[in-house]
A protein has these predicted regions:
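Long hydrophobic alpha-helical segments that form multi-pass transmembrane helix bundles
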Residues: 133-169
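Signature of multi-pass transmembrane helix bundles
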Residues: 4, 13-27, 101-102, 106-107, ...
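C-terminal ends of transmembrane helices
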Residues: 56-72, 116-128
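Alpha-helical transmembrane segments in multi-pass membrane proteins
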Residues: 23-31, 46-58, 87-95, 99, ...
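Helix-coil boundary and interhelical linker segments in multi-pass alpha-helical membrane proteins
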Residues: 33-45, 98-105, 147-156
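N-terminal signal-anchor module of multipass membrane proteins
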Residues: 1-59
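Cytoplasmic-side transmembrane-helix entry/capping segments in multi-pass membrane proteins
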Residues: 73-89, 108-110, 128-139
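Short, amphipathic, aromatic/basic-enriched membrane-interface segments that mark the entry/exit
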Residues: 11-21, 62-83, 99-103
């Protein structure tokens, strides 16, 4: 009997990180839609800002890291070829973790910059970070703006108006 020892990964799949992250984005669509329906335009703006800032931060990091800021068309093509949707997932998760009462629109921007630049890219990029970048961005926002993100307010009254006594004991 031959014992074969090999390093991980032991299960191999043809699916790439890009495909897996796209599946994660699709799986988060119901939660995203519910957040926008329940909390309105503030949630939609927070989601768009966090996702856009996360992708922009990764793009700027890519430009700085590869020192290719002179040729814009080639830079965009190279970035698009290696883009794997992880920054979109990080931005979306960060936005979904933020409270609904978050009306200071610079907060998801700062959280996304911290999540991508400090937590993800500083440690080597996709798969090499020591903590989840989205949650680290949320913790950064909590530590930096404790009073503004500690007491979220949700208005579920329109949803519960059809069920009298839903919140009573």
């Amino acid at each position: 009997m031959n014992l074969i020892v090999s390093s991980a990964p032991h299960i191999r799949s043809p699916r790439t990180t890009k495909h897996i992250m796209l599946d994660v984005l699709i799986a988060l669509l119901p939660a995203t839609a519910a957040g926008i329906v329940f909390f309105g335009w503030v949630a939609a703006v927070t989601i768009v800002l966090a996702m856009f800032t996360a992708v922009l931060t990764e793009f700027v990091w890519y430009i700085i890291e590869h020192k290719i800021w002179r040729n814009g068309k080639e830079t965009l093509a190279n970035f698009a070829a290696q883009f794997d949707f992880t920054s979109l997932v990080t931005g979306l998760l960060l936005a979904l973790c933020c409270p609904a009462s978050l009306e200071a629109l610079y907060m998801p921007v700062l959280g996304a910059i911290f999540a991508i630049a400090v937590v993800k890219m500083l440690f080597g990029g996709t798969g090499k970070n020591i903590v989840n970048p989205a949650i680290a961005g949320r913790v950064f926002l909590f530590i930096s703006f404790m009073a503004m993100v500690s007491y979220p307010e949700a208005n579920f009254a329109p949803l519960l108006s059809y069920t009298d006594g839903a919140l009573s004991t």
